[in-house]
Amino acid sequence: MPLAQGPWDTAFWLICLGISINAAVVPLHAWLVDAYPEGTVTGSVFLSSFTTKVAVYCLIRIFAGTDFLIWFGVLMALYGACYAIMENDMRRLLSYHIVSQVGFMVAGVGLGTAMALNGATAHAFSISFISHCSLCVPRDHLCDWYPQNQPAGRSC
């Protein structure tokens, strides 16, 4: 006997939850902000390319036009931007920036129109290249550009 009938059944919500974790939707985003800065440069680039962007693709294929994604996308965009402004560590700042940018993509998926879905896809494609470039900056060079990022008693 199924738990529920129709498009809003248990399987729908479990699949949505799994993809939302992968997309780092705001209540489920903590793994991204902790994992990206701590990984190696190569690891961060691969994480940036193959986690959130694949999740956005899955959202496009499965959940296009789902209204609640609009609100989660707007929340992600605002949350990521606000926390990026307050962050002192450059790689964590870039991680919050990724949360913010994925929020724009999720909001586009929630709209569900052809133009919004094309925009979300193009945004995911272009942000993956921008993330590659920005996450490839070694930590040693970040201290030259962002001097208040230096730990006390240590010079970069």
What do the predicted segments below correspond to?
Residues 1-156:
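Hydrophobic transmembrane alpha-helices and their helix-loop junctions in integral membrane proteins
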